[in-house]
């Protein structure tokens, strides 16, 4: 309900994005499905996607979510990378290789922040590049406890890690 209230109060937004979480899906699955209809970008992890749709075919899930109206759907799959759906395409990308995971807490939020930061600067034309940006940012988050690694991250470091990400 809060998300719908916020959306209704924003006048002429550039875009609306939602990043789901298990609690919402557990308590309000119908509301989450309605929320998808109101956003331009929908992000969630693979477990949340399967829980919400009741099956494990992630390509079909991406298409289901896209049919509700978002321009971009991104399913985060942790160490298996992510799945980006837009238009009639579904692209899978890797995570950044050879990252020592110290603490995965906040990786999904960092990923979403990286995606949205890219889109805020460059627009919606390249959702795969946006997801690569998010993947790179998240790689810094998981390689330390808390946010300590993010304080010193510069754009050139983010771009260096993007070069290591593969389209699968």
Predicted regions and their residues:
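Ribokinase/PfkB-type carbohydrate-kinase core domain
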Residues: 1-41, 46-91, 123-125, 147, ...
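Glycine/charged-rich beta-loop-alpha catalytic/anionic-binding loops adjacent to active sites
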Residues: 89-100
